[in-house]
């Protein structure tokens, strides 16, 4: 009977250890995926910032040209 108890405890212990290792690996994978998502979000944010900055410059230039031509009389 004692032999069966020891065997059962050993099986349960090994099962818990392997389960713990699997959960740890799963957590690490989730952390890596989250970090990749954060990096992609930062890249998208930087791209949008650059695009909006460029669009603002173009709009400013066009507005300046439009307003400049409005103030001058045609000859």
From Swiss-Prot:
It holds the Pfam family FSAP_sig_propep. The lineage of its organism: Eukaryota, Metazoa, Chordata, Craniata, Vertebrata. Its main location: secreted. Residues 30-41 have a biased composition (Acidic residues). GO terms for biological process: defense response to bacterium; defense response to fungus; innate immune response; killing of cells of another organism. Antimicrobial peptide with activity against Gram-positive and Gram-negative bacteria, and fungi. Has hemolytic activity. Disulfide bonds: none annotated. Expressed by the skin glands. The keyword Signal applies. It is found in: Secreted; Target cell membrane. Residues 25-44 are annotated as: Disordered. Residues 23-45 form a propeptide. It comes from the Eukaryota. Keywords: Amphibian defense peptide, Antibiotic, Antimicrobial, Cleavage on pair of basic residues, Fungicide, Immunity, Innate immunity, Membrane, Secreted, Signal, Target cell membrane, Target membrane. This is Dermaseptin-S11. Belongs to the frog skin active peptide (FSAP) family. Dermaseptin subfamily. Residues 1-22 form the signal peptide.
